[in-house]
Amino acid sequence: MANVVVVGAQWGDEGKGKIVDWLSERADVIARFQGGHNAGHTLVIDGKVYKLSLLPSGIVRPGKLSVIGNGVVLDPWHLVQEIAKLRADGVEISPESLMIAENAVLILPLHGELDRARESQNSVAKIGTTGRGIGPAYEDKVGRRAIRVADLADEATLALRVDRLMVHHDALRRGLGIEPVDREALLTQLREIAPQVLPYAKPVWKVMNEMRKAGKRILFEGAQGALLDIDFGTYPYVTSSNVIAGQAATGTGIGPGAIGFVLGIVKAYTTRVGEGPFPAELQDADGERLGERGREFGTVTGRKRRCGWFDAVLVRQTCATSGVSGIALTKLDVLDGFETLKICVGYELDGERLDHLPIAADQQARCTPIFEELEGWSESTAGARSWADLPGAAVKYVRRIEELIQCPVALLSTSPERDDTILVTDPFED
């Protein structure tokens, strides 16, 4: 039996929600280990749609323990809203089904204000932040001035933490022309929200290790995608946390030896939200067609996603940096009806061919894609549940992807419905 880490292997929006839900039915624990409420995931269960951005996907399944690890930055007000919305939809949530790391960092209103002010004043190169305060919260964590969940339990400690935080933020706000933070108003907000958050606070590292020793199946749920990783993504157009699989251990307090299988979620084409390099991007009718057929709009922001052909170079890189054991290929059905498909197999930069994306942003922007053409198919792949249900050209497309990324397909998803999945390798039994 293997504990499984699920990571996005592109720029996010790969369809992780469905795959995590599909796996969570057999997991005992589902844990978020990085990010905040900036990356949404959509679940379709028995025809009902759930849109989550902070809570783990397992929260909608009775009898599962959902965990928000220390690697996550937590907006407590958004947490309470998301819990209330799910309860209104009939989902039962209690401290027995949801656990939050007591050392998780809080996102405060001042973080969102700072995030948005910086983005609006940055006329040189916008990062494309969602403006929800995730980046500034991580800055405070690394700067050792953050307020954490456990701080809510002691008013004297909380007041000291706020004072220390204000020294930094008031200086930043003066430079940006923003009014100073109202310290007393912030303390009042934190005191009011504390009773709604503290019942879920636990030493997650301890519980996770106890679960592991008891032989419980653990599913680690990543948000966003490896190409947005703060170290290995297309910097500076990245998120503020590590997204790759190694963060699953750091972000929950469990040792790396607990990870048995890394499942990389990969869309059958490529999308990206916001700014940054995108070598295989299509700005023509094919790109529009992919966006329309794939309904490529962000779950959280509603922003239209940029679309392009499958980039094998980038996925090969992310499979390496996350140690991916196998991929789940999603949205194959979006490619139905294309006479010809293309896969990016390399880049050209200043007359040289590259087999990887260079690290320097200016070089990334100058890379042009080298495409390989494949025959498309006219038949529908939607709802296929076995290889025999797929057109021959679709099977060839999948096999070519495996060859190029040097990683096998473990799962193939052919629609948003959780059961429309072709299982090749069971991650939990690997």
UniProtKB/Swiss-Prot annotation:
The keyword Magnesium applies. Binds 1 Mg(2+) ion per subunit. The keyword Transport does not apply. Its main location: cytoplasm. It is an enzyme of class 6 (ligase). IMP binds at residues 13-16, 38-41, 130, 144, 224, 239, 303. GO terms for molecular function: adenylosuccinate synthase activity; GTP binding; magnesium ion binding. Homodimer. Plays an important role in the de novo pathway of purine nucleotide biosynthesis. Catalyzes the first committed step in the biosynthesis of AMP from IMP. This is Adenylosuccinate synthetase. The gene is purA.
